[in-house]
A protein has these predicted regions:
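Small-residue-biased structural context
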Residues: 1-2
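N-terminal acidic leader/helix
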Residues: 5-44
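A structural signal for alpha-helical segments
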Residues: 15, 19, 48-55
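Generic structural signal for well-ordered, non-transmembrane alpha-helical segments
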Residues: 25, 29-32, 36, 54, ...
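Hydrophobic stripe of amphipathic alpha-helices that form coiled-coil interfaces
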Residues: 34, 41, 45-48, 67-70, ...
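Short, charge-rich amphipathic interface segments used for partner binding and complex assembly
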Residues: 51-82
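Long, amphipathic, charge-rich alpha-helical segments that form helical bundles/coiled-coils
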Residues: 82-89
Length: 89
């Protein structure tokens, strides 16, 4: 089940390319694997809940968990928070 590209996944890929170019391919693959696993785990959710899970919640979790491979937890959290803040402006 391939997820539609969201602002979170787009911003994650941009961060990976700009800040971790040598690891970007592996980070993108790890992000995609984690996101697909999260989507599969939540496949039974209601249609209304699915929308929010697919567009924001699960991509945010996947980005946060994947970024922790290359940065401290707090920095990963602030990075993902920055994606949301940027969209809100």
């Amino acid at each position: 089940m391939k997820a539609k590209e969201t602002y979170l996944s787009r911003d994650f890929r941009e961060t990976a390319a700009q800040r971790f170019p040598a690891q970007a391919k592996q980070l993108n693959a790890a992000f995609d694997m984690r996101l697909n696993a999260l989507l599969a785990e939540n496949a039974g959710a209601s249609k209304e809940k699915q929308y929010h899970l697919k567009r924001q919640i699960l991509p945010g979790i996947a980005a946060y968990e994947t970024l922790q491979r290359v940065m401290p937890k707090e920095e990963a959290l602030q990075t993902v928070h920055g994606y949301v803040e940027h969209l809100a402006r």
